[in-house]
Amino acid sequence: MGAYKYMQELWRKKQSDVMRFLLRVRCWQYRQLSALHRAPRPTRPDKARRLGYKAKQGYVIYRIRVRRGGRKRPVPKGATYGKPVHHGVNQIKFARSLQSVAEERAGRHCGGLRVLSSYWVGEDSTYKFFEVVLVDTFHKAIRRNPDTQWITKAVHKHREMRGLTSAGKKSRGLGKGHKFHLTIGGSRRAAWKRRNTLQLHRYR
């Protein structure tokens, strides 16, 4: 086994004495820092590399702190208006994961960079911490490399806002197999539209 494989196994055994101590110390360290800050290097180099990170110019790591728990509906004094079924304010569950929220915040803060992917690095009772891999698409090391040229195209601007990253796709119900029949055709809306549209072909 290579070094990265050993590292991967370490992260899979989070309840081991070493990892429990490490995660506890790191969570304390991350809490002292701002909610969004640049990390000098990835905390999990094995995971970052599997997601496409390379230790060369053009790649940036940002660490994001996201508050855990449900989402409160942002309405003044609980005045939601409308029918009683939509009066809920407190017990609202957000449709997307906290990881995709972290990616979105990193993408907003670094508008000139592209979000490649992200991964979990720690959590406590109040916060979850994620590291987001961003790419500078104007750097020659990225533009001249055939493996990374795809992300320089304009169609990939703010992928994280449109649910195109790995974390964003999870809440869209996309995938293969019998569990993902609701999104056959690209999305929930596309599947619903096709199933609820009456097609009267000329030759039928």
From Swiss-Prot:
SUPFAM superfamilies documented for this protein: Ribosomal proteins S24e, L23 and L15e
Compartments where located: Cytoplasm
Keywords annotated in UniProt: Cytoplasm, Ribonucleoprotein, Ribosomal protein
GO biological process: cytoplasmic translation
Record has Cytoplasm as a keyword: yes
Listed PROSITE patterns: RIBOSOMAL_L15E
GO cellular component: cytosolic large ribosomal subunit
Membrane-spanning residues: none
GO molecular function, one term: RNA binding
Cited InterPro entries: Rbsml_eL15_core_dom_sf (IPR024794), Ribosomal_eL15 (IPR000439), Ribosomal_eL15_CS (IPR020925), Ribosomal_uL23/eL15/eS24_sf (IPR012678)
Complexes and interactors: Component of the large ribosomal subunit.
Record-stated family: Belongs to the eukaryotic ribosomal protein eL15 family.
Function recorded in the entry: Component of the large ribosomal subunit. The ribosome is a large ribonucleoprotein complex responsible for the synthesis of proteins in the cell.
UniProt-recorded name of the protein: Large ribosomal subunit protein eL15
Organism: Carassius auratus (Goldfish)
